[in-house]
C-alpha cells in the first residue's frame, strides 16, 4: 500500500493504557502502509522532540519534513494544540460513544474528517445525528467492527480449564447510564449459588493504566485467565455494545455466556450461534440451569466453542486492517 498514516497520541497514553486494542489494531494497519509512525506529546527522536508550545502541524513538519500524510489518526485530539488545523485528512476512532455531549464536542472541535465507529449501533446513531447538522464541512462516518489480537487471544492447550465458570472485566461501575455492566454486577453474586462442586471465580479488573501496559503483559495474562475457564461470563453493558470480550473470549477457545448486544443484524445472528445467552430478564434459576447444562454437557459446549472460533476468524486485527483501509479509501 502507498498509504502514509500518522497516529498522534500521547506517549503516556500509548505506554500505560491497559486496553491495547486501539494500538494493536493500528499496528496491523501500519503493516499494510508504505509510511507510518506514532507521534505526539512525550515522543522524541534523533530529529526532534514534541513541543507542547507548537501546533500539531508545526510538530509534524519539524519531525517529518517533506512527508505528505494521507491520514492523521488522533487519540484525545483536544489535548494537542490546534489538532483541528492539521492540513491532512483527520480521523478519530471510537470504541464507546455513549457520552454524547463529550463525543459530539470532540468530533466538532477536532475538525475531524472521518469517524471510525467500532460499534454498529453508535455508527447508525451518529451518522443519522450528523446528517441533520450543517457544519463547516462534511464528516464521513464508517463502521469498522471491533477485532482482537489473534497472537495473544488464542487457545493455549497447556492451560487446563480448571475453572467451571469465571467472570472477567469491570463490575459495579457507575456512569451516566447508571450501572454500566448490570448483568456482570448481578452475576458476581449469582454464581455463588451454583452447586458447591463447581469451581467459580471472579477475576477483578486490573485497572485502566499501568506503566508497563505497552509490554502486553496484562493482555497476555487476561488471555491465560480466559483459557483457564470452561465458561466465561461477560455482558454488553448499558449501551448494549459489542465489547471486545465478545471476540476475545471465543477467540481463546472458551465458551462465552452473556446477553445479546445491539449491533449489525447479521452479526447478531452469528453471535447467537455460539453464545450461552443469559440476560437480565431471566430469573436466577433459569440462568443457573443454563450454566450447569453447559458445564455438564461437554459435547454441546465444545460445539459452541467451535462455532465461536470460526466466528472470530473474521475479527482478527489482520481483518480489521483490511476493513479500515477499505473505509478510508471509499
Feature-to-residue mapping (PLM):
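Nucleotide-sugar donor-binding catalytic core of glycosyltransferases
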Residues: 2-251, 255-272, 318
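Amphipathic alpha-helical repeat elements characteristic of tetratricopeptide repeat
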Residues: 216, 284-285, 302
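Aromatic/hydrophobic pocket-lining residues that form the small-molecule binding cavity
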Residues: 222, 226, 287, 301
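Residue-level signal for the nucleotide or nucleotide-sugar donor/cofactor binding architecture
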Residues: 244, 282, 315
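Short, contiguous hydrophobic alpha-helices characteristic of membrane insertion segments
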Residues: 256, 274-282, 323, 327-330
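A charged, aromatic-enriched C-terminal amphipathic alpha-helix characteristic of glycosyltransferases
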Residues: 298-328
